């Protein structure tokens, strides 16, 4: 093809060639501007294309991509209706149709350790992020509550009881690790582990009185705050004639027996639960208590002795003020005691003097006073509902580990539906940003946090909004769960604060994303010692490292965020390409595929698309099906185009050299004429076959200049052209324009200074006063990663 030289743009041969290409571009535009062939068909008529069923895929891999693109514009794919269609495309299934999970009765609950980071990290790693994390807060606008019995999803109908049993073990393991609160009553929960400083003011402090009973003191007060009566104590150490029916009356207010009954039936038999009543009596209730019997007996005691109980409540004198103790013990003792009319102590085994309840029937064992190690009782600044907001089920830990279970928490009510929340955004690097921030030629080490989300503590009032259950007990997340959209944002703040301090303290290039840390340094031996120091530094602050996923020593090739990264290039693993080619080969021409399945397919294509010679416009037909929620049918040429994309695999350079070439070609258009001007003084004016919108005429001239001259950059006075967002154009033209203009830079020049503005108006070009600017938005890179 002739290239323009000095004063050569007016040559007749070049003009004839340019006019020929211009007519081809105009025909491509005009064939689709009148009627868009990709509009959804509301019925599956005979016009639906279904040739070549069973035809093997033999694409001509030697053919240029431009030829394959043009063939796809002739043999179009089709959009169908909303009737049921195929949900499987190779190994891909619909996005909302999960692969059937198989229940494993031998599932093991993974080892979960107490992840309590030291609040000294606020001083060691100064950052404004900590005010959002110590503690984190979660305030949904509205909440839908579900019954406790619906806590475990019926994911495995044939193994309901076994599924609930393993979920119960899993939740108990989380509770033992200090990740969950366990509900005792409407105003009282218990947890294990070291309390945070914001929890200390809500801790229930129990003191031993001389007669052996325990009193529950909240912030130094022993009054009944519900009735707002004068400070009266129900328990007197020298009162030997206390009526045993007072147990039933106390249960009317804040009875641990009633809370046990409300938590569901007894499916698991475990250790006796110790709970503190505000009146000073502590009743041990076994978890296998019968809920109906317990509730009925408490009701009977309340009805029979309500008047006598109230009068005795008002006549009691306070025993004196207990001073607020600052030393909180690490264990809570709860004695199971009662008073008979004769003054004898009644144990849970003696059922003659206590009201008939679940505690008197099923608590024959473990009725002696017990000590709960490292346990705390907390009366939060909120009520603890006996309902749940999320549901649970178990799956395999991953495809390689099917012996251990993974707990899936469904808090989707906070991300969709009437309770949907708008969670804050956070910086997430795309591929272009990652290419620009990664250092070249440095050894790298990858660190991975263990139980990353469980490092993030929640405000107790926020925890009450994140309630789950195994069908028997109600638990609340004390640490951030994985099923809430706020958790990734909190984790981003957490790791960013740590990464900034690591980079400053150890003088190493550090990049963090979610629970991954990437460390780079020119000296491999120095980087190895730094990585050990970083691990020690984090572990001293109570932050746990997953050494199974951590790079043991500096390496040159590393897998990070799904990319294979070496010293100079980024690429996609070959196994991923093979899987994608296999899926494309299994596409049946003319078969209807459900839009959810297409959505899954497009997600995989989008990930690999930057590593091909294609562009996003090539996927527009599938996006149209997803947007309209209709079925999709592949044509033979379109399937060949997708396969061709996976054949031209390329690798991307890390830290690509940014060049700003000087513009030598300018274009301009009017509704009737278009002009191309070269810096050497040559120019050409071409007439359009018909009048169209001005932005289409401008784009036609820019595409023509790219075909005929092949410059490194082009000047244009159309912002529509310079932004390269052509999704509003017909698919044929948009795909070709994107393909032509992606490799080159487009500069915006005001019409007043556009050198091609003169030739389009039959005036000479003027390159003397040239003012231009690129309109591409600068990629945002955090300040700490700039200049490294």
From Swiss-Prot:
Region (Spacer), start-end ranges: 201-365
Regulation of its function: Activated by host HSP70 and HSP40 in vitro to be able to bind the epsilon loop of the pgRNA. Because deletion of the RNase H region renders the protein partly chaperone-independent, the chaperones may be needed indirectly to relieve occlusion of the RNA-binding site by this domain.
Family matches, as InterPro entries: DNA/RNA_pol_sf (IPR043502), DNApol_viral_C (IPR001462), DNApol_viral_N (IPR000201), Hepadnavirus_pol/RT (IPR052055), Rev_trsase/Diguanyl_cyclase (IPR043128), RT_dom (IPR000477)
Region span, Terminal protein domain (TP): 1-200
UniProtKB keywords: DNA replication, DNA-binding, DNA-directed DNA polymerase, Endonuclease, Hydrolase, Magnesium, Metal-binding, Multifunctional enzyme, Nuclease, Nucleotidyltransferase, RNA-directed DNA polymerase, Transferase
Reverse transcriptase domain sequence ranges: 376-565
Ubl conjugation recorded as keyword: no
GO BP terms in the entry: DNA replication
SUPFAM superfamilies referenced in this protein's UniProt entry, alphabetically: DNA/RNA polymerases
Region (RnaseH domain (RH)): 656-788
EC number, as in UniProt: 2.7.7.7, 2.7.7.49, 3.1.26.4
Reaction equations catalysed: DNA(n) + a 2'-deoxyribonucleoside 5'-triphosphate = DNA(n+1) + diphosphate; Endonucleolytic cleavage to 5'-phosphomonoester
GO molecular function ontology, one term from the record: metal ion binding
Coiled coil feature spans: none
Binding site for Mg(2+): 448, 515-516
Residues annotated as site: Priming of reverse-transcription by covalently linking the first nucleotide of the (-)DNA: 96
Start and end residues of each stretch annotated as Disordered: 36-56, 220-242, 288-380
Region feature (Polymerase/reverse transcriptase domain (RT)): 366-655
Role played: Multifunctional enzyme that converts the viral RNA genome into dsDNA in viral cytoplasmic capsids. This enzyme displays a DNA polymerase activity that can copy either DNA or RNA templates, and a ribonuclease H (RNase H) activity that cleaves the RNA strand of RNA-DNA heteroduplexes in a partially processive 3'- to 5'-endonucleasic mode. Neo-synthesized pregenomic RNA (pgRNA) are encapsidated together with the P protein, and reverse-transcribed inside the nucleocapsid.
Domain notes from UniProt: Terminal protein domain (TP) is hepadnavirus-specific. Spacer domain is highly variable and separates the TP and RT domains. Polymerase/reverse-transcriptase domain (RT) and ribonuclease H domain (RH) are similar to retrovirus reverse transcriptase/RNase H.
Family (UniProt): Belongs to the hepadnaviridae P protein family.
Protein name (record): Protein P
Native source organism of the sequence: Duck hepatitis B virus (isolate white Shanghai duck S31) (DHBV)
Taxon lineage: Viruses, Riboviria, Pararnavirae, Artverviricota, Revtraviricetes
């Amino acid at each position: 093809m002739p290239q323009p030289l000095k004063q050569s743009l007016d040559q007749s041969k070049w003009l004839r060639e340019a006019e020929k290409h211009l007519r081809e571009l105009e025909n491509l535009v005009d064939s689709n501007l009148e009627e868009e062939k990709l509009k959804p068909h509301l019925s599956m008529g005979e016009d639906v294309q279904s040739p070549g069923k069973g035809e093997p895929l033999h694409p001509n891999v030697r053919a240029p991509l431009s030829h394959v693109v043009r063939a796809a514009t002739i043999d179009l794919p089709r959009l169908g209706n909303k009737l049921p269609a195929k949900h499987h495309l190779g190994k891909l299934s619909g996005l909302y149709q999960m692969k059937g999970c198989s229940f494993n009765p031998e599932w093991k609950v993974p080892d979960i350790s107490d992840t309590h980071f030291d609040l000294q990290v606020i001083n060691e790693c100064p950052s404004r992020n900590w005010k959002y994390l110590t503690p984190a807060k979660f305030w949904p606008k509205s909440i839908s509550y579900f019954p406790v019995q619906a806590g475990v999803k019926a994911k495995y109908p044939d193994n309901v009881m076994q599924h609930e049993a393993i979920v119960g073990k899993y939740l108990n393991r989380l509770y033992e690790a200090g990740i969950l609160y366990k509900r005792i009553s409407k105003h009282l929960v218990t947890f294990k582990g070291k309390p945070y400083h914001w929890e200390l003011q809500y801790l229930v402090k129990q003191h031993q009185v001389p007669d052996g009973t325990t009193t529950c003191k909240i912030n130094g007060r022993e009054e009944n705050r519900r009735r707002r009566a004068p400070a009266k104590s129900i328990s007197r150490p020298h009162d030997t004639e206390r009526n045993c029916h007072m147990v039933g009356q106390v249960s009317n207010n804040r009875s641990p027996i009633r809370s046990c009954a409300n938590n569901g039936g007894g499916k698991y038999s475990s250790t006796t639960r110790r709970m503190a009543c505000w009146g000073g009596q502590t009743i041990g209730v076994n978890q296998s208590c019968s809920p109906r019997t317990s509730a009925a007996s408490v009701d009977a005691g309340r009805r029979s002795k309500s008047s006598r109980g109230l009068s005795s409540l008002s006549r009691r004198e306070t025993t004196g003020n207990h001073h607020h103790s600052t030393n909180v013990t690490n264990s809570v003792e709860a004695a199971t005691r009662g008073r008979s009319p004769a003054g004898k102590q009644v144990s849970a085994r003696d059922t003659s003097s206590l009201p008939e309840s679940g505690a008197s029937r099923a608590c024959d064992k473990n009725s002696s006073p017990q000590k709960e190690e490292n346990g705390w009782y907390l009366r939060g600044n909120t009520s603890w509902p006996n309902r749940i907001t999320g549901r649970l089920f178990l799956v395999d830990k991953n495809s390689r580990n099917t012996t251990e279970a993974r707990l899936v928490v469904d808090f989707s009510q906070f991300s969709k539906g009437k309770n949907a929340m708008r969670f804050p955004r956070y910086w997430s690097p795309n591929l272009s940003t990652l290419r620009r921030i990664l250092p070249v030629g440095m050894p790298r080490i990858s660190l991975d946090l263990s139980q990353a989300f469980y490092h993030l503590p929640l405000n107790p009032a926020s925890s009450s909004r994140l309630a789950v259950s195994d069908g028997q007990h109600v638990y609340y997340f004390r640490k951030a769960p994985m099923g809430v959209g706020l958790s990734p944002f909190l984790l981003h703040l957490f790791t960013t604060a740590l990464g900034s301090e690591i980079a400053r303290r150890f003088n190493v290039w550090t990049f963090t994303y979610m629970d991954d840390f990437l460390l780079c340094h020119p000296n491999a031996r120095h980087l190895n010692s730094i990585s050990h120091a970083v691990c020690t530094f984090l572990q001293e602050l109570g932050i746990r490292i997953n050494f199974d996923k951590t790079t043991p020593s500096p390496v040159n090739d590393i897998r990070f965020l799904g990319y294979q990264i070496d010293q100079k290039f980024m690429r996609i693993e070959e196994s991923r390409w093979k899987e994608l080619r296999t899926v494309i080969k299994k596409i049946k021409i003319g078969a209807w595929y459900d839009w959810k399945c297409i959505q899954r397919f497009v997600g995989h294509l989008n990930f690999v698309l930057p590593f091909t010679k294609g562009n996003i416009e090539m996927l527009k037909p599938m996006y149209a099906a997803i947007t309209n929620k209709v079925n999709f049918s592949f044509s033979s040429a379109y399937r060949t185009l997708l396969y061709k994309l996976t054949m031209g695999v390329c690798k991307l350079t890390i830290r690509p050299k940014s060049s700003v070439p000087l513009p030598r070609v300018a274009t301009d258009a009017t509704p009737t004429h278009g002009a191309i001007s070269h810096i050497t003084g040559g120019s050409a004016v071409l007439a359009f076959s018909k009048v169209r919108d001005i932005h289409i005429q401008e784009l036609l001239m820019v595409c023509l200049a790219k075909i005929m001259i092949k410059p490194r950059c082009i000047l244009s006075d159309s912002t529509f052209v310079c932004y390269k967002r052509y999704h509003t154009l017909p698919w044929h033209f948009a795909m070709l324009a994107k393909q032509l203009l992606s490799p080159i830079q487009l500069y915006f020049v005001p019409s007043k200074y556009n050198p091609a503005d003169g030739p389009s108006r039959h005036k000479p070009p003027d390159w003397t006063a040239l003012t231009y600017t690129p309109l591409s938005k600068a990629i945002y890179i955090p300040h700490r990663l700039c200049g490294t």
